[in-house]
């Protein structure tokens, strides 16, 4: 019994790694010696037997068993065993445990049986078939082993991760490679896998994943998995780091099925499964101690087992006989007996057999002899505890058994270790309903093929599932919840009921974690094709239930047997001095490894032998070593008491040394970790520095602005654009179809028309009025009526009657044929349209997929958000990323500032180069380019900054102070203003110098031209001395002044308008951006100072430019005004002289020859030249210029001007002229300086010198008319009379005749003669005066004629009308302003020159000399000028000049004569009409 119980424990341990073989463990004799010392003398034969057992290994040891055990001893043993049987914790009989022991012993291949026993020596473990056959036939004839081919069968289980065809191919390949074997060796697998030509690293990983059992060989599912993984790698996919749970479960399940289906053909595979399946029936049989027959009952029937076991109790000799017969029937039974010795380490079979008689016979005695003599109980007491530990796990061996149970539940990967058998045996020994029933060998063998153990992975899965459903952590799951969970499996209700019954053996109506795992495992096995067992397999008994029951039963049995043995043997008198400790040493938690007195190992504590020499270990440190079971609170009181103080101190020192060593190791480990941490930190810092440097390089790169362009935004815009195009496709297709329909209808209509022409009488020409153009009956009736009328009309007209109408069928057929043709074309086009539409859709879909794949990559988006937006990273990394972003933004701002400063420098240089050509500084609006920002915020900030800068510039241009320019102090502002003034002065000086140089250049050109001018008309008639040098100079200056005035006016107006606009915009934008600027202050505080500096610089530039321009404008205006006033004075003075001289000349010419052409041959150029110019001064009569203003001033009062529209004549006072000069440029400004005064009334035009400065406009007309000098002379004579009244008409003439605008430049024309010299001032009043004075000079050949006419000015009545008439005729188109003037009497001679001046540059070709007098009369408004000026007498030499001066000085007399002349001239004018 002892060996039986311990064999279960030892058998379990023997199968575990790290446990010594049975033969190496301490002999059982030592333990039995201790036991014998405790027993009475009746037990002495037992030690003797043991001694013999220890002494040798012979069959004689079996004899000492009967010899050593007297009947009394047997009775005493039986006396103890009935107690064991009576205990509720041990309901099973003692004999089946012997068989149980045998079953476990059959697992130990190390044991040998001496030849004396008659048992053959078996190094390999027996299979269940062999053991069953040995039971069946005592003769020892073993049945023939099953065919090996049965093991090569592959279960018909479908693997889900490969196809059926692939699985069939893999099966064929596997069978061809392994033959009858169930596994493929590593070499064969290597040869096959190398054919895939995959790298060695991949094949190594595939092998690691495929070899799930880690056995170095592959089962078929593992081979199929390897081929599947090879296929994955060959197709380019990556290998997984771990197998998916589904594939792993399928492979492991199929491997279990294969490995347990063929235990007989491969003993090494069936070895782990034999024990548990054999244990189960033995436990159910409840046979207690006789362990030697444990492994056998898997195959034999229950009756055979009982028969063999009953032989033992019938008689002592029968028992050894039975044992021997059992050994005889078992070729390997000796090994099974030795496994009992496995419970007693190091014993051989003979020893173990002796041990069996020694202790087992006590066990057999209780089995067969219930109630023998009392001396035996000490033996059963000692054995009983040993048995109890074997059953309950109370001893260290039992500790291994409960350890095995958890191993099956999660600490063992497969049930092949034999532990399931031991635990099944222990569970069978526990009182459970239904365990007393017998089992057939078939049932036992069936159980042996099914592995019911729960692996660690499965247990973890079940526990997680339980925790998930146990939301309130109650520790159990109720029936309703379990029904809900288990109902999801899809099993039948009957199967679920059976599973529930098995999982809830106590009928509590709820399942704890272990029971729930059992239920789930049964469901899992049922789903995998396993039948639901009728009774719960021992491997599936929850450890909590089994351990609790075993513990309770063990304690009860130990207490009862100990008390009984002590009472019978008297050992209670010295419980600690007997050498055997029943309670302390037999700790069912295995806390102590040393027996109390003698230092010998108790049979129940053999498991701790290997660790006994390792020194002291506390219970806390031992806890994990005992496979999770909590050791006893104290290792052993006896051992503690027996340790001396020195030993304890030694142990303490050793422990202290160990602790110090551990602490030292911990410190070393901590130091190493610190060193590694420091190294890692250094590496991290170096990497961060590298990242920063790379980021800086990126930011400073010229193309850095393009790296952060939002490709996603562009891609989204492309997708939106693509979507818009896709939306247009249906509409386009609809339009195409509509057009196709229209085309088809048009074709049909065209065919009908053609058919109607070709067959006029056919019905095809009937126009249908029905829906869709269908021909109705009414249409046919109308067609027939129309045909009849056509026939009658033909008959009446005598025409041949039209041929008979064709039948409607022919026309319908033609129409139908054409319709079919058109329809076919239409369908063809529709098909093409559909194809195009489909292709467009496909193309759009491909484009959309491309854009979507590039943009909607979740991994890329996650990485971007993680490493760019710092989402989901540690704080250190997030701070680092933010720091990089700040540095990038700062680098971008610096780069933008640099580019902006460069741009501003460029603009400033441009501004300095041409400050006067720009009305306002444009850099303010575009000084900063739209450089793309690295981020959206940067772009927004840059836009705001540019807007703020524009606002500041506009405000500066408008004269407003920017609101944010608060950093400028008073001193800075003063310095800035001082600098601005200096710059303005400098610029003004530069402009004056440049203007003076230009003026000097023009003067030099005019002087050079005037020197060459007189030579041209010399061939015809020597013209008067050209006094045009000074006049031209004045004319050029006047033109320059005029241009400057116009330019200044334009600039001022543009500046004013732009200033107003900018001020308004600045005010609006300032209001809008004040809040934004206020918010940006904190963010851009660092950039603000530089920005304000730039703004101040720009503002200073703008203000300086404005001030410079304003100063220049004012200077130009002042200069122009002064020049105009002077010119006006000179104009008035010289105009009077010109009028007088011109009138005298005209009278002389009229007297000499009526033919104007002959008389104008010499004076034509002289008359034409001054038409557009007003001579400023005369070289001949400088004094006249000074005295001339006096006469006009005296003549001004009497000029009440009969024309209200012309209040002042050309001879109005210089004051009025000055006023007109000062105000006209502003009043009548225009883009075209030559058309400014067109809209002004004639009187303002006459009074202002503006028409004089604009005289060059009409110079081309004189040039055009200069082809005929006589006509020009006549025109000059006609126009010379109203010299002062044509200022307004000149403007209108120039506008009405713009064909010569190309020569209207007043800058540099030298119109000295009538030939080809055209100067802008040629027709001006100054030039005319110069010519007039020139004619007075002595060299003039016409001086004699001038001498004849000094007296004519007083009586020019007959001549004035003629002059007046000729002037208007030449000036016919220029007298528009005079049309509104009332017709007062024609002006006196003094008025004639003004007309000539004004109309000098007539655009109309020279008309015939006699112009209409009525037209002349309106143009006479200049009568305000006194007609009697004596200048007519001056044309002839010095006397004429003196007479002219005298007449000019006599202002009042002239005024008085003017009145008389006016009446005379009016009469003369009427006579001329």
Swiss-Prot record:
Q: Can the keyword Iron-sulfur be found in this entry's annotation?
A: no
The answer, when asked if Cytoplasm is one of the entry's keywords, is yes
Q: What binding partners and quaternary form does the record give? A: Component of the PAN1 actin cytoskeleton-regulatory complex.
Q: Where is this region: Disordered?
A: 1-121, 134-153, 266-366, 609-645, 793-837, 891-1265, 1277-1473
What topology does the record note for this protein and the membrane? Answer: Peripheral membrane protein
One of the record's GO cellular component terms: actin cortical patch
The residue stretches assigned to a coiled coil in this entry are 678-759, 963-1163
Where in the cell is the protein located?
Answer: Cell membrane; Endosome membrane; Cytoplasm, Cytoskeleton, Actin patch
Cite the record's Acidic residues compositional bias ranges. Answer: 1152-1165
The record's listing under SUPFAM superfamilies reads: EF-hand
Biological role: Component of the PAN1 actin cytoskeleton-regulatory complex required for the internalization of endosomes during actin-coupled endocytosis. The complex links the site of endocytosis to the cell membrane-associated actin cytoskeleton. Mediates uptake of external molecules and vacuolar degradation of plasma membrane proteins. Plays a role in the proper organization of the cell membrane-associated actin cytoskeleton and promotes its destabilization.
Which protein are we looking at? Actin cytoskeleton-regulatory complex protein pan1
Biased amino acid composition, Low complexity: 24-47, 79-92, 344-360, 925-934
């Amino acid at each position: 019994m002892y060996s039986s119980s311990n064999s279960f424990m030892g058998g379990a341990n023997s199968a575990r790694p790290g446990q010594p073989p049975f033969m190496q463990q301490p002999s059982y004799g030592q333990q039995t010696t201790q036991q014998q010392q405790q027993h009475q003398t009746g037990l002495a034969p037992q030690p003797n037997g043991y001694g013999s057992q220890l002494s040798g290994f012979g069959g004689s040891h079996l004899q000492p068993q009967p010899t050593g055990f007297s009947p009394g001893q047997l009775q005493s043993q039986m006396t103890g065993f009935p107690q064991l049987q009576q205990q509720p914790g041990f309901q099973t009989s003692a004999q089946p445990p012997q068989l149980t022991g045998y079953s476990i012993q059959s697992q130990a291949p190390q044991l040998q049986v001496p030849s004396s026993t008659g048992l053959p020596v078996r190094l390999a473990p027996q299979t269940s078939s062999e053991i069953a056959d040995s039971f069946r036939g005592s003769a020892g004839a073993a049945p023939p082993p099953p065919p090996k081919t049965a093991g090569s069968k592959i279960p018909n289980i479908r693997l889900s991760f490969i196809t059926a065809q692939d699985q069939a191919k893999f099966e064929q390949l596997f069978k061809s490679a392994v033959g009858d074997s169930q596994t493929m060796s590593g070499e064969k697998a290597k040869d096959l896998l190398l054919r895939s030509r995959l790298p060695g690293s991949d094949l190594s990983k595939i092998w690691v994943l495929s070899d799930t059992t880690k056995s170095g060989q592959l089962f078929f599912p593992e081979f199929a998995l390897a081929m599947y993984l090879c296929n994955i790698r060959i197709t380019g996919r990556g290998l997984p780091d771990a197998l998916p749970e589904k594939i792993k479960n399928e492979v492991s399940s199929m491997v279990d099925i294969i490995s347990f289906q063929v235990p007989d053909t491969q003993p090494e595979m069936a070895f782990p499964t034999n024990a548990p399946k054999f244990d189960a029936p033995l436990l159910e049989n409840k046979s207690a101690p006789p362990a030697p027959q444990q492994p056998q009952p898997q195959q034999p029937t229950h009756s055979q087992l009982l028969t063999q076991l009953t032989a033992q109790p019938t008689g002592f000799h029968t028992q050894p006989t039975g044992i021997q017969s059992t050994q005889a029937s078992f070729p390997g039974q000796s090994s099974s007996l030795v496994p009992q010795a496995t419970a007693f380490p190091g014993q051989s079979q003979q020893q173990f057999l002796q041990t069996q008689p020694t202790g087992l016979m006590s066990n057999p005695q209780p089995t067969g002899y219930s109630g023998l003599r009392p001396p035996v109980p000490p033996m059963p007491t000692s054995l009983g505890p040993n048995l109890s530990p074997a059953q309950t796990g109370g001893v260290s061996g039992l500790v291994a058994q409960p350890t095995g149970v958890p191993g099956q539940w999660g600490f063992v990967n497969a049930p092949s270790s034999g532990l399931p058998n031991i635990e099944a045996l222990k569970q069978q020994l526990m009182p459970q309903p239904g365990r007393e029933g017998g089992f057939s060998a078939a049932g036992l063998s069936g159980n042996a093929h099914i592995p019911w153990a729960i692996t660690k992975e499965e247990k973890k899965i079940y526990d997680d599932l339980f925790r998930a459903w146990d939301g309130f952590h109650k520790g159990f799951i109720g029936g309703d919840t379990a029904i809900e969970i288990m109902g999801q499996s899809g099993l039948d209700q009957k199967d679920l009921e059976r599973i529930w019954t098995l999982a809830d053996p106590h009928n509590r109506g709820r399942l704890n974690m272990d029971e729930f795992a059992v239920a789930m495992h049964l469901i899992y096995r049922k789903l995998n094709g396993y039948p639901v067992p009728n009774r719960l397999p021992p491997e599936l008994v929850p450890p909590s239930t089994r351990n609790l029951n075993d513990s309770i039963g063990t304690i009860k049995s130990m207490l009862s047997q100990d008390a009984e043995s002590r009472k019978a043997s008297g050992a209670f008198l010295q419980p600690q001095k007997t050498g055997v400790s029943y309670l302390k040493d037999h700790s069912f938690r295995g806390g102590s490894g040393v027996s109390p007195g003698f230092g010998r190992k108790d049979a129940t504590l053999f498991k701790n032998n290997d660790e006994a020499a390792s020194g002291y270990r506390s219970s806390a440190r031992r806890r994990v070593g005992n496979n999770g079971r909590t050791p006893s609170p104290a290792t052993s009181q006896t051992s503690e008491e027996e340790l001396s103080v020195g030993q304890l101190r030694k142990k303490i020192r050793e422990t202290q040394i160990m602790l110090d060593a551990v602490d030292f190791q911990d410190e070393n480990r901590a130091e190493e970790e610190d060193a590694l941490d420091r190294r890692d930190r250094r590496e991290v810092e170096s990497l961060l520095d590298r990242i920063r440097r790379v980021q800086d390089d990126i930011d400073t790169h010229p193309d850095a602005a393009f790296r952060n362009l939002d490709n996603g935004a562009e891609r989204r815009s492309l997708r939106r654009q693509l979507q818009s195009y896709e939306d247009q496709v249906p509409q386009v297709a609809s339009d195409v179809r509509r057009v196709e329909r229209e085309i088809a209808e048009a074709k049909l209509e065209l065919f009908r028309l053609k058919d109607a022409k070709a067959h006029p009488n056919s019905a095809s020409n009937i126009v249908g009025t029905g829906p869709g153009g269908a021909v109705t009956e009414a249409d046919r009736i109308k067609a027939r009526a129309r045909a009849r009328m056509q026939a009658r009309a033909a008959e009446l007209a005598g025409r041949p009657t039209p041929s008979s109408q064709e039948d409607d069928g022919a026309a319908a057929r033609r129409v139908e044929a054409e319709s079919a043709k058109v329809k076919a074309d239409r369908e063809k086009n529709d098909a093409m349209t559909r194809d195009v539409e489909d292709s467009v859709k496909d193309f759009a879909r491909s484009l959309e997929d491309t854009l979507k794949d590039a943009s909607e990559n979740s991994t890329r988006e996650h990485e971007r958000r993680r490493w760019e937006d710092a989402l989901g990273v540690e704080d250190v990394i997030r701070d680092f990323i933010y720091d990089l972003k700040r540095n990038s933004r700062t680098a971008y701002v610096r780069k933008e500032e640099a580019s902006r400063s460069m741009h501003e420098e460029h603009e400033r240089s441009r501004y300095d180069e041409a400050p006067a050509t720009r009305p306002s500084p444009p850099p303010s609006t575009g000084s900063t380019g739209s450089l793309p920002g690295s981020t959206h915020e940067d772009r927004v900030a840059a836009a705001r900054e540019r807007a703020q800068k524009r606002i500041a510039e506009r405000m500066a241009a408008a004269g407003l102070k920017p609101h944010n320019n608060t950093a400028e102090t008073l001193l800075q502002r003063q310095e800035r203003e001082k600098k601005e003034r200096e710059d303005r002065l400098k610029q003004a000086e530069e402009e004056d110098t440049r203007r003076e140089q230009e003026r000097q250049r023009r003067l030099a050109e005019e002087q050079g031209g005037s020197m060459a001018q007189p030579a041209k008309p010399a061939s015809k008639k020597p013209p008067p001395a050209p006094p045009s040098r000074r006049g031209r100079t004045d004319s050029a200056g006047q033109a320059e002044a005029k241009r400057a005035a116009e330019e200044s006016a334009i600039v001022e107006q543009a500046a004013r308008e732009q200033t107003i606009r900018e001020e308004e915009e600045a005010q609006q934008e300032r209001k809008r951006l004040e809040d934004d600027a206020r918010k940006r202050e904190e963010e851009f505080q660092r950039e603000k100072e530089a920005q304000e500096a730039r703004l101040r610089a720009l503002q200073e530039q703008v203000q300086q430019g404005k001030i410079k321009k304003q100063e220049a404008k004012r200077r130009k205006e002042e200069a122009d005004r002064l020049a105009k006033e002077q010119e006006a004075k000179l104009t008035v003075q010289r105009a009077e002289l010109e009028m007088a001289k011109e009138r005298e000349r005209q009278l002389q010419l009229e007297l000499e020859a009526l033919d104007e052409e002959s008389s104008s041959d010499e004076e034509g150029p002289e008359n034409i030249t001054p038409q557009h110019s007003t001579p400023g001064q005369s070289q001949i009569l400088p004094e006249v210029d000074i005295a001339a203003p006096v006469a006009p001033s005296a003549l001004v009062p009497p000029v009440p001007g009969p024309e209200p529209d012309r209040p002042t004549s050309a001879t109005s006072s210089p004051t009025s002229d000055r006023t007109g000069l000062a105000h006209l440029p502003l009043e009548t400004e225009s883009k075209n300086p030559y058309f400014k005064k067109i809209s002004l009334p004639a009187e303002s035009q006459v009074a202002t010198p503006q028409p004089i400065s604009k005289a060059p406009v009409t110079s081309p007309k004189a040039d055009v008319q200069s082809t005929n000098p006589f006509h020009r002379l006549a025109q000059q004579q006609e126009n010379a009379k109203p010299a002062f009244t044509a200022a307004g008409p000149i403007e209108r003439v120039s506008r009405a005749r713009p064909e010569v605008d190309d020569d209207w430049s007043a800058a540099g024309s030298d119109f000295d003669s009538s030939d080809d010299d055209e100067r802008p001032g040629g027709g001006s009043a100054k030039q005319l005066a110069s010519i007039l004075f020139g004619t007075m000079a002595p060299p003039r050949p016409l001086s004699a004629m001038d001498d004849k006419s000094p007296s004519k000015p007083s009586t020019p009545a007959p001549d004035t009308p003629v002059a007046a008439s000729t002037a208007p005729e030449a000036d016919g188109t220029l007298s528009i302003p005079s049309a509104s003037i009332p017709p007062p009497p024609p002006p006196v001679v003094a008025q004639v020159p003004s007309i000539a001046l004004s109309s000098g540059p007539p655009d109309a070709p020279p008309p015939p000399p006699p112009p209409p007098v009525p037209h002349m009369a309106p143009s006479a408004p200049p009568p305000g000028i006194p007609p009697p000026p004596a200048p007519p007498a001056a044309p002839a030499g010095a006397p004429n000049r003196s007479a002219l001066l005298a007449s000019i000085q006599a202002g009042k007399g002239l005024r008085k004569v003017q009145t008389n002349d006016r009446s005379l001239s009016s009469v003369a004018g009427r006579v001329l009409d």
